[in-house]
Structures are given as C-alpha cells and as structure tokens.
Amino acid sequence: IGSFGFVTFYHKDYKEADDTAYKILQITDVHILNDEKKDAKVYKTVKNMVETTKPDMIILTGDLTSEKENFTAFKSFCSFLEDFNIPWGFTFGNHEGLDIAYEKNEVLDPEKIADRQTLSDYLESLSNCIYEAGDENVDGTGNYYYNVTDDNGKVLTTLIMMDTHSWDKENNGYDHFHDNQIEWYENTIKSIAKEVNGDESKVVPSLAFFHVPMKEYMTAYEEAKGTDNRLWGYRFPNEDGTPAVDDMMFEKMVELGSTKGCFAGHDHMNNFSVMKDGIRLTYGLSDDHNIYLTPLRGGILINIKNDGSFTTQHLIRHRGQNTITIGKEQ
C-alpha cells in the first residue's frame, strides 16, 4: 500500500446495511465562510448524503466555520442542519475561537462574531441539537454523552462527544485531552455501566467523537502497513495534525474496554480507518471548499447494529461531480 491506504469504492443505489438499528452520518471540517458560491457546494453535498442515506443522527466533529464573522456562518449552517428535523450533535474544533483572527482590542460586532461560550449557548438553544456544554469543572466546552437505544429502550451504544481544544502554547502544537477530561470519560463510562447493567465493570459499547485525532491514529497507520490489518481510505503524505503530546486517552479507552470506535476530523486530506488494540480509528471526510482543495469530500456513515457493534461506509463526492459514491461496508 506504499504511502497510502486503500479502499474499494463503487457506484450503486444506496441500500441500508443488514441488521442496522441506528445510522449516524459524521461530517467534519465544513468551514462555512459566508462565501455564497463555495458554501453552496458544502450544503449540496451534505443534503445529498442525508437524502440518500436517511441517517437517524448527524454528528459534526468540529471546524464548522473559521474565525472571521464566525457567528453569521455558524448560525446559517446550524439552521440548515435543524431543517432536517433529526437529532444532531457537535464537537468544537480548533477554528471556532476568536484568538487567531482578531486583535486584542478590536471592536467586534456581537451579531456576527462570537466566542466559544456564545456559540455553546446558541447550540443549547436549538430544538434538534443534542449538544450540551457539559460540566464546567471539566476543561473544554462540550464534553457530553448520548445513549442510543432500541425501540424497547435498551441502550445499544453510548456516543461520547469531547472537546480537543485548539492550540497547546506550552508544547507548540495542537492541543489534546486534558487529565480531568480523561477522568470525566472514565467516570462517565463506569456510571453508564452501573446504571444500565448494575455493575460499573460491565461496560456498555461506546463510540467517541472529537476533532483533533489522537497520536495513535498515525501509530496505527504505520503499524498496519504490510500486515493483515487492513487499511481503509487514504492518507496524504506528511498530513499529521495529531497533538504535540501523548495524553494517554487511548490507553484509558483500551483499559476500560467500552469504546470500540473513534471518529475525528482536522486533517483535511486524510480519511483512513484502521484498527488498533480493538478500537477502530476513523477520520471523517472534510467537506471544506474554502481552505484546502481536497479531492475527496463527503462523510462517514456509521451503521450501529442490534447487538451494539457497528460498521462504517465512506460516502465520497469526487471533485467536479455531483453524485455520491457509496463505499462498501467495513
């Protein structure tokens, strides 16, 4: 597979995967910038994916917009998602803040510009958005969870949404999960196990969604080359936006045994998916038309099964094409 991963895609009419109880569409890095022509391409791609696959939920893993006039763009895309009238979740990326784009003493228009807290409050006001700001004593904005249940109310899987912050000035690189977030994650997993199964050691399957990928994404990619551990998708050479430090979050996931899949964004040119230590590490596909000339845009369809397991399918919109290519179930 050389410097790249691989995946077999094929054109076909969409058919729901067998034994699917719940479908989630992951989208990421849409970077709405109030550019009517470019933004329209994002809206069209997302609308096409939703109408084709009819997901039960949409999760956007960060970088909905960038810093300049972010509130205008943010509200526009949120309104668009609300109109699908299905639940949708959100995790903050590294571009929703204001510290990069504006001078310290610059006068900002509150109707057009917003800090993270204002964006968080806005998300919580929306009727279809499941976002929660989370515990104020835990670092980050938007550490929360959502239980997916079957028709009888049985919890099939827990969706863990977490904030990976923005820039780590101390280590001069992208930020990571902080210690009290990892503690929150552990407490959440054990609390759900106790509530659902009466024993905190009997964990419920979970999937984690966040923006900046853990360092293990790159480790897993390198370890998989030349082995039977099949790589799905694509890695752009030297595209590595993982954190500056190892935060030990992955080790905690392995220790607890609940989280079976992680879904990140951030690295616009990467969309690979690979197994490591029993956890599927998956990049979403960037839908950005403003920052990078990404050749493949689209999303990841997550098919949660009746036993709590899951599969994924890449949904691809090739540059210059209006149709969606449906990937094989993985």
Regions found by a protein language model. Name each.
Residues 26-28, 58-63, 88-94, 208-210, ...:
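Active-site neighborhood of phospho(di)ester-bond hydrolases with catalytic His/Asp-centered motifs
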Residues 2-76:
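N-terminal active-site segment of His-dependent metallophosphoesterases
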Residues 8, 12-13, 75-196, 200-201, ...:
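Extended active-site neighborhood of metal-dependent phosphoesterases/phosphodiesterases
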Residues 53-56, 158-161, 172-267:
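His/acidic metal-ligating clusters that form di-metal
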Residues 25-43, 65-72, 98-111, 169-176, ...:
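Acidic/histidine-rich helix-loop elements
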Residues 21-34, 156-165, 209, 280-286:
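Active-site-proximal beta-strand elements of phosphoester/diester hydrolases
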Residues 33-36, 66-69, 90-102, 167-170, ...:
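Active-site environment of divalent metal-dependent phosphoester hydrolases
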Residues 145-153, 249-256, 270-330:
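Binuclear metal-dependent phosphoesterase catalytic core
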